[in-house]
Amino acid sequence: METNTLLSFENLIDAVGGSLIGSKSSNFCFSSAAIDSRKCVKNSLFVPLIGSVQNGHIYIRQALESGASVVFVANSELSENKANFENLAKEFNATFIAVENTMTALQKAAKRYVEQFPSLIKIGVTGSSGKTTTKEIIASVLSQKYSVVTNEGNLNSETGLPLSVFKIRAEHEVGIFEVGMNRRGEIS
């Protein structure tokens, strides 16, 4: 695996079913993930989401300027912008990966990352109300004996949870994750 990276290039490409745009960076590495370009730091994976109002792809340059080193790009953005993405990859020595859907790719990458920790005890907290408090109480009790990782605050959504699992490290013994939903059938 590349030094200090959460997933190797090959593992990431395989997990997300992606393809390389341009060339792989000579120093491929990502040690965190972000969906907000303003939250990118050195060696971040930037995942630009496409919403009903905004398209995160317009913030790729800002993410790279903030330190992002790996970028997912939705296939739907490639036809008009492939040359631009290739130029940005060269300019910033970054790795760009084309994926069908950036949200789904984030979730698949997070799933693959968690699979690297088979001995991690995983606890999911769901419910109508009180999830964050319950998660914090469980974490407080278990942290007396174990090294515990949790999602921060109430980052429990379809984007927040995948971003949170990238905080798991080898020293963690227990992961306690709050899982929220905003539509029927979202948790399965």
Language model: regions and residue ranges:
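N-terminal leader/targeting and accessory segments in enzymes
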Residues: M1-K108
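Phosphate-binding loop of NTP-binding sites
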Residues: A98, M103-S188
